[in-house]
Amino acid sequence: MCCLFGIYDYGHSLTAAQKKRLVSSLAIASEDRGTDATGIAYNHNGHLTVYKRPYPAHLMRFKLPDDAACIMGHTRMTTQGDGKHNYNNHPFEGTAVIPFALAHNGVLYNDLTLRKDKNLPPTRIETDSYVAVQLLACLLYTSPSPRD
């Protein structure tokens, strides 16, 4: 299964280097739960940034801005959707009134039924988890907007 991790710099007391070190350490510690891909999401200057790669966490290189107070991350063990295709990796981007990022740990066994029953739009994203992004977007009358 996968792993979720993150930090919240509530007092804005950490430097970008300290946050990077913390997030990197958490990601590497999370490799026991998945090495097929690693990704992070954070807000920078009012814009959602998602960075993900089909690498284990110990090979992932990233930068964090000083103003990123909340950073979420995900290490993936592939269960559905080839992890070599980065669009299948977490976190996923969507829009439901405002842009959001979603990462999921687990397996949705009814994703194909949900796609059909809720008449969700076709997507090249093959994971079961992405149906949650689509459902959130449809619930609030917007559509997901994945970026690779």
Predicted regions and their residues:
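Conserved short alpha-helical segments that host acidic/polar catalytic motifs at enzyme active sites
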Residues: 1-143, 147
